[in-house]
Amino acid sequence: MIDARHTVSTACQFINVPMGIWVDEKGRVVRPAEPAWTTDQTMKIGAKSIVTEGTAYLTALRDWVANGERSKFVLSDEEFARRVKPRSQAEMEADASFKLAVYFHEKGNNDLAQKYWAKAESLNPDDWNYHRQDWSFTPDQAGKKWLEKFQKLDGSYYPKLDIKP
């Protein structure tokens, strides 16, 4: 799916890729946004590493597909609520700024688009989707910009997968 306006990522609180949510047959979200890898991998980049946990995620996903609401990986309402954080004022302003940037870009006003992308990125620097969208317009610089941002991280590039039963 192509989500150029980031409608799905906003609604589901996706801040990086790949991320997933689990939606059951009744339309109920039973697991909120979390990293959704398919392989285990450790990528060393300079002094930092990106660690993915695909085996654990796929094991849980397969259990849910096989067992549905009886899966030990379906979250209780209380645990689900604990994991979904309310959006802060800055995050909501970042989302509005991002949408303005997309609008101005589509209308050909790249100066205003760039202004609002920069605002979105500064208001919610943890949302890598904003940065990636901005970098997509300068593909020759995207890798360099990604590496600079990655090297400045205090924490992890991806949140730790919390998929225990």
Segments (PLM) and residue ranges:
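Non-globular targeting/processing and membrane-anchoring segments
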Residues: V30, P35-P165
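Acidic surface patches and DE-rich sequence motifs
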Residues: D24
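Short, internal strand/loop/helix patches
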Residues: M1-V17, I21
